[in-house]
Amino acid sequence: KSSTPQVCREAMNNMFKIIVSGDEEKTQEAIKMFKDYFKSLPPDEIAFPRGITDMTKWSDRSAVYKKGTPIHVRGALLHNNRVRSLALEKKYQLIQNGDKIKFIYLMVPNVIQENVISFPGHLPEELELHKYVNHDLQFEKTFLDPIKIILDAIGWAAEPRADLQQFFF
């Protein structure tokens, strides 16, 4: 899907080939290797691409965004708020309706006390959010959840399962 990061789409194609070969262990190893690689990538490459609309509808003067705001719109409003609070409007363009953006999950606590940020193409270092990128959740949502649908259908697990015999022998 176009809403999936390109690096994940490519990895899914490779994963399907491994799954079709019929080897659960090789599939699990490939998932682990991709996860390690995924964690080394910059936010720009692993974030969800989206289009942005209705920003004004969800904007709130007192709380940045209204309850029920879609996650990518919430991230865009938080981006604009952060850029303004750091007086970086001259250096970085604010996100507007119609823009193509990316959004990524963050670990909380962080400097904005939110679990998401959106950005147009590149997440500026000055926003001080790179170290808070939630790689585990991002990996789960962008790659693992879609792959698990197929693995569940054929009775496979994404990671090796411990069974009782391993505890006793």
What are these regions (language model features)?
Residues K1-F169:
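DNA-dependent DNA polymerase catalytic subunits
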